[in-house]
Amino acid sequence: METTEELSTFLTAATVDGILGRLLYRGAAWSLMRKNGVLPQNAPPLGATIETDLAEHGFALLRGAMALRAQAGASELTGKAFERAANAFEALVRNGDPESPDRGFRRTIAAAAYHLAGFSAVAFSIFNEIEEDLNVSPGEIAIRHLILRDLDQLRGFVRDWLNYGAHGDEQIAAALQGGDADVDEVLSTILNTTICRALAFFDFALETGEVESFEAARGLLTTAVGLADNAENVPLWWISNLCRHLIDDLWQHSLHQNLPTEPPEGAEERYPDLRRLFISSLYARKTSEVELWPSQREAAQRSTDVTDDLVVALPTSAGKTRVAEIAALMTLSSARRVLIVTPLRALSAQTERTFRKTFAPLGFGVSSLYGASGLSAGDEDALRTREI
């Protein structure tokens, strides 16, 4: 096993811009120029072995990043390595051969690596733009649902897989004892079942906040990684290992872990229930919202302190509204009201809809107050009576 210093040295060298004859730049151009995996005849020379080079470079970066993250935790270096690995695998699948047997495997790796690099929106788009026929394993399908935050689909898929008779422990044991079973096929079934069972535990952890369920999921995936290693099942070793890092990352940045359990002063009675309802309502959305984005984390942490003053300057779509929602949650739990001032009427309407969607399930009213033609009696009433 390499030391942390050795892994850091390797990844620092492997992520230098323009390494290997600008391989990643050539790979991006190669993927954009081709159609169904075939380059046009007038394409410039991008390297006869570019596909092999991209795969080898991507796997090397991915292995090193996972190993360093396991030893020393996430860092700027591991994030950069995951991003460069994702670039390599994205180049391998974009506009690729639709009949390639490993197209689904490589796409899953690209999306997972982007997610671990902190680019969950890019990971989402890697999966959201494709058709269903990807030649993927059950474990890869489950990871796809997790990355797309379609937890209803994830729950249904793993339930169906785990309830299918041939995937039960007794049936698998009987097949092995019968002597007629293909051992590699049985091991693949065991590994996919373990991944699905782990994600069932993890889904429950995201729903309830139970640390024990997260630890059970992580333990199952650690077992799967060891079994895949011993069985020399290379694809499922990558998938189970990536899945373990994915749930680590998601849990670390989940709302359960980042919204304080200790209530603000004076909110001891209301805050625990409001916190639970807030997280549950976001989890229950069609596209579940279970974690904080990298752009939100520092501001969100400060917004939980009701004694703090805060100005948050972030680009469009970087998640400012979620920070405001967390600040509002802490304020409302202290039995105080929230006033939102926006510079545009259109933004007022959008913010009103967003806050109503979030806070109506918690029992709070959101006013419609735009002030276009002075202050009416109804406006005065809204200011006096509405919580937001």
In which residue ranges do the predicted regions lie?
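N-terminal helicase ATP-binding lobe
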Residues: 1-388
